[in-house]
């Protein structure tokens, strides 16, 4: 049985990571444009709260983000970040062109949203994991995900050379999907992603950075770095105290790609 809080429209399960920032962004946008209300519930993965019986009822995949829509007669659970984006965009008829009247634009936005979840997110996440959180150096994994992260950045920069926004001419869930990961470039030069190498990505970051919701999430990301814990994350992957407290293969400020 899902606990209902009738005081808010949505319950948002989060933990302040890239995929959850996507949902934070769209909820802030909808709060500004449609007056929606929501309650954030933090799931501490370092304490394995995502494996609790209560949370598994929300998401059997044991990951955040997830939402519970409480606006109808019965609550509706949605998990997986891009699924949530599509659900909310369709529900409020915003950030996603209508399929019946604009099938090409609709397809472009959904395609680039799914592209992020299938390509950009996994490449960035795995490269960052093996660079910083892995208790041991794994050269093959670093090389593999270095190449993939480099590839997706180049592809996205090319896309943004012909379109101001990722999904087309208007801000959409395609932008929100990638922003969850790429907003970090405003604070730390991960992947050695500079304006010189990827001018169109940084032009896009400046463009979306003018939005109030993005400004708020940027502030949260900045604050999040103050509470960053390598040991806490590593505890998810090993019980060995020496490995948990070992020096990272590289420092957080030096997670960079090696360019050809």
From Swiss-Prot:
<comment type="similarity">
    <text>Belongs to the GST superfamily.</text>
</comment>
<feature type="domain" description="GST N-terminal">
    <location>
        <begin position="7"/>
        <end position="96"/>
    </location>
</feature>
<dbReference type="InterPro" id="IPR010987">
    <property type="entry name" value="Glutathione-S-Trfase_C-like"/>
</dbReference>
<dbReference type="InterPro" id="IPR036249">
    <property type="entry name" value="Thioredoxin-like_sf"/>
</dbReference>
<dbReference type="InterPro" id="IPR036282">
    <property type="entry name" value="Glutathione-S-Trfase_C_sf"/>
</dbReference>
<feature type="domain" description="GST C-terminal">
    <location>
        <begin position="102"/>
        <end position="228"/>
    </location>
</feature>
<protein>
    <recommendedName>
        <fullName>Glutathione S-transferase domain-containing protein DDB_G0280881</fullName>
    </recommendedName>
</protein>
<dbReference type="InterPro" id="IPR004045">
    <property type="entry name" value="Glutathione_S-Trfase_N"/>
</dbReference>
<dbReference type="GO" id="GO:0005737">
    <property type="term" value="C:cytoplasm"/>
</dbReference>
<dbReference type="Pfam" id="PF13410">
    <property type="entry name" value="GST_C_2"/>
</dbReference>
<dbReference type="Pfam" id="PF02798">
    <property type="entry name" value="GST_N"/>
</dbReference>
<dbReference type="GO" id="GO:0004364">
    <property type="term" value="F:glutathione transferase activity"/>
</dbReference>
